[in-house]
C-alpha cells in the first residue's frame, strides 16, 4: 500500500511540475503573440478601441462620448467567442450527465433531458451576450439587464431540477444536492466562457492552476504529515493537508502573479484635444494582467498604501479561492460516497470523468465569476462584459 501511495504521489508531483512548465510556455507564447501578431485574439491591436470625444473648446464641456471595439475585429472576436461557447456547452452537457447519472442511474431520458437543458441554457445565454458586446453597445443598463437575466436563469434551473427530480424515488437530500451541484456546474461553465473570452485565456488557466495546486499540495503534505481527519465524508483528507494545500497555493499563485504582472503604477491615461487639453480616459487595462483580470485590482495609487492594498487584496482572494477549491473537492467527494461510486464516469479513462478532474475548479470558478458579477453591478468604472483593452485611437 505504501509503494502505491508513493508511486501515486510521484505521479501527482510530476503532473504539477508539467502544468507549471506548460503555463510558463503559454506565457512565453502569449508574449510573442501579443508583440508580433496583430490577429491574436489577445493581442494589443486586436483589443484596440476607438475613443469618440465631444468637445466645445471648453475644458468643462469636454467629454468622452464612447469607446468602442475596433470595427475591423468585431466579427473575428464574435466568431472566436462562438467557438468557445459551443465547446463549453458540450462540456456542460457532459458534466450534468455525469452528475445526474451518478444519482439516478435508471432514468436515462430524464438524465439526457436535464443535461441537454444545461447546455442549451449556456449557449442560449452567452451567444446573444457576445452579439451585444461586439455588434451593439454594452452599457450600464445592459449590464443590469444581463445580471438580472443571469439570476433568473439560475432560479429557473434550480426550479426545473427540483421539480423534475420530485417525480422519482430519491431522498430529498439527494434531490437538493443534485440541484445544487448542477447549478454550480452551470455557473462554472458561464464563468469559464467569461474568463476565457473577456478576460483572456491566462485568467482561466490561472484559476484552474489554483485548483490543481490546492489539490496537489493537500495530497502530498497530507500523506506525509496528516494526522487529524478534516471531515467524515472524506477520511483521506486531513487538516494538515488542507493547511499546506492552501499555504502552498497562496505562495505559488502569488509568485506567478508577481512574475507575470509586476505591480507597477498604472496612471490614468490621458489624450489631448486640439486645444492641448488633457482628457481623462478609462483605466488602461492589460489584456493579460492577472491581477486586474482575475482579482479586479486596479493600480491607481502610489506609495506604501499601494503595496499594502495590492498584497492584502491579492493574497486574500487567492486564499479564498483555495478554500473554495477544497470545498468543491469535498462536495463532489460527498456525492460519490453517497452514491457509492469511485468515479463519475470513465470518459477520461483512468482519470475518471470531467467532474472528477474539475470538481475543485468548478467551485472556485463559480466563486470568482459571482465576484465579478457583484463588482460589475457595484462599480461604475468596470462593467462585467467590458473587455480588457488598450485605448489607442481617437476620433
UniProtKB/Swiss-Prot annotation:
A GO BP entry is: CDP-diacylglycerol biosynthetic process
Q: Name one Pfam family in it.
A: CTP_transf_1
Q: What is its EC number?
A: 2.7.7.41
| Bilayer topology | Multi-pass membrane protein
Q: Does the keyword Transferase apply?
A: yes
The EC category is transferase
The entry's cellular-component GO terms read:
plasma membrane
Q: Where in the cell is it found?
A: Cell membrane
**InterPro entries given for it?**
PC_trans, PC_Trfase_euk
Q: Name one GO molecular function term.
A: phosphatidate cytidylyltransferase activity
Protein name in the entry: Putative phosphatidate cytidylyltransferase
Which organism is this protein's natural source?
Mycoplasma pneumoniae (strain ATCC 29342 / M129 / Subtype 1)
**Gene from which this protein is expressed:** cdsA
Amino acid at each position: 500500500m505504501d509503494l502505491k501511495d508513493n508511486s501515486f504521489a510521484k505521479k501527482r508531483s510530476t503532473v504539477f511540475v508539467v502544468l507549471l512548465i506548460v503555463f510558463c510556455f503559454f506565457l512565453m507564447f502569449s508574449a510573442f503573440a501579443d508583440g508580433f501578431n496583430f490577429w491574436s485574439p489577445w493581442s494589443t491591436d486586436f483589443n484596440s478601441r476607438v475613443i469618440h470625444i465631444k468637445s466645445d473648446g471648453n475644458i468643462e464641456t469636454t467629454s468622452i462620448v464612447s469607446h468602442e471595439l475596433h470595427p475591423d475585429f468585431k466579427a473575428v472576436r464574435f466568431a472566436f467567442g462562438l467557438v468557445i461557447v459551443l465547446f463549453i456547452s458540450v462540456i456542460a452537457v457532459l458534466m450534468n450527465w455525469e452528475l445526474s447519472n451518478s444519482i439516478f442511474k435508471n432514468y436515462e431520458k430524464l438524465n439526457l433531458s436535464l443535461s441537454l437543458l444545461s447546455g442549451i441554457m449556456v449557449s442560449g445565454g452567452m451567444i446573444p451576450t457576445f452579439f451585444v458586446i461586439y455588434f451593439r453597445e454594452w452599457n450600464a443598463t445592459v449590464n443590469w439587464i444581463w445580471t438580472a437575466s443571469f439570476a433568473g436563469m439560475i432560479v429557473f434551473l434550480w426550479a426545473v431540477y427540483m421539480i423534475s427530480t420530485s417525480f422519482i424515488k430519491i431522498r430529498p437530500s439527494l434531490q437538493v444536492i443534485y440541484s445544487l451541484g448542477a447549478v454550480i456546474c452551470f455557473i462554472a461553465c458561464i464563468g469559464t466562457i467569461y474568463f476565457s473570452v473577456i478576460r483572456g485565456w491566462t485568467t482561466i488557466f490561472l484559476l484552474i492552476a489554483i485548483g490543481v495546486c490546492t489539490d496537489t499540495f493537500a495530497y502530498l503534505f497530507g500523506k506525509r504529515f496528516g494526522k487529524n481527519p478534516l471531515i467524515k465524508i472524506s477520511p483521506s483528507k486531513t487538516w494538515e493537508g488542507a493547511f499546506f494545500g492552501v499555504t502552498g497555493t497562496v505562495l505559488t499563485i502569488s509568485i506567478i502573479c508577481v512574475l507575470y504582472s509586476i505591480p507597477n503604477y498604472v496612471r490614468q491615461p490621458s489624450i489631448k484635444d486640439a486645444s492641448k487639453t488633457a482628457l481623462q480616459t478609462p483605466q488602461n487595462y492589460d489584456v493579460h494582467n492577472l491581477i486586474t483580470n482575475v482579482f479586479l485590482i486596479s493600480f491607481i495609487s502610489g506609495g506604501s498604501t499601494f503595496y499594502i492594498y495590492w498584497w492584502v487584496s491579492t493574497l486574500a482572494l487567492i486564499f479564498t479561492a483555495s478554500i473554495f477549491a477544497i470545498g468543491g473537492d469535498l462536495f463532489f467527494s460527498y456525492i460519490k460516497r453517497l452514491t457509492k461510486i469511485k468515479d463519475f464516469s470513465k470518459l477520461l479513462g483512468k482519470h475518471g470523468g470531467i467532474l472528477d478532474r474539475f470538481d475543485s475548479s468548478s467551485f472556485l470558478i463559480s466563486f470568482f465569476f459571482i465576484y465579478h458579477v457583484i463588482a460589475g453591478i457595484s462599480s461604475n468604472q468596470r462593467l462585467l462584459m467590458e473587455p480588457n483593452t488598450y485605448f489607442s485611437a481617437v476620433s
